[in-house]
């Protein structure tokens, strides 16, 4: 539904911190499904870990937050160019169930739980081959910058 060029319109992140490769489903105000292709060519694997490459859990959480940001921006019909930004405001109930390794395609499924006074709450999961990798409740703050 959104390729990388479209995603870049809704996220201010750029290489090497843009964690979403494609959005495959988006229902404004409700949910998003996006994915990231994990490659051995990513710089993070030079140090995490050279002889046992594992994609860091904290970057899985960041990818979830970025998917939430795309959903929020699309729902509110805003972009970073308008001076809007979604800031990572909090996280609850994080669980890591399996490792993510080079060659995996990680799907992120995020659903809006609430949106009040610029604070959005999302229930999120990450999956590889249909198997649960990570789950969390993420909060984002919709703010104006500049």
Curated annotation (Swiss-Prot):
Tagged with keyword Lyase: yes
CDD domains given in the database record: FabZ
Catalytic reaction(s) noted: a (3R)-hydroxyacyl-[ACP] = a (2E)-enoyl-[ACP] + H2O
Example GO BP: lipid A biosynthetic process
UniProt EC number: 4.2.1.59
Annotated Pfam families: FabA (PF07977)
Similarity field: Belongs to the thioester dehydratase family. FabZ subfamily.
Alphabetical list of PANTHER family matching this protein: 3-HYDROXYACYL-[ACYL-CARRIER-PROTEIN] DEHYDRATASE
Name of the protein in its database record: 3-hydroxyacyl-[acyl-carrier-protein] dehydratase FabZ
Organism: Teredinibacter turnerae (strain ATCC 39867 / T7901)
């Amino acid at each position: 539904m959104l390729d990388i060029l479209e995603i870049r319109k809704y996220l201010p992140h750029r290489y090497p911190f843009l964690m979403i490769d494609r959005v495959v489903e988006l229902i404004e105000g409700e949910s998003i499904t996006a994915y990231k292709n994990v490659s051995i060519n990513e710089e993070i694997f030079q140090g995490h870990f050279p002889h046992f490459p594992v994609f860091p859990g904290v970057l899985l959480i960041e990818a979830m937050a970025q998917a939430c940001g795309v959903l929020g921006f699309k729902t509110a019909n805003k972009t970073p160019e308008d001076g809007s930004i979604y800031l990572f405001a909090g996280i609850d109930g994080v669980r890591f169930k399996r490792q993510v390794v080079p060659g995996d395609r990680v799907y992120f499924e995020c659903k809006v739980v609430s949106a009040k006074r610029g604070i959005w709450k999302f229930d999120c999961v990450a999956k590889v081959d249909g198997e649960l990798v990570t789950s969390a409740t993420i909060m984002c703050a919709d703010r104006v910058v500049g």
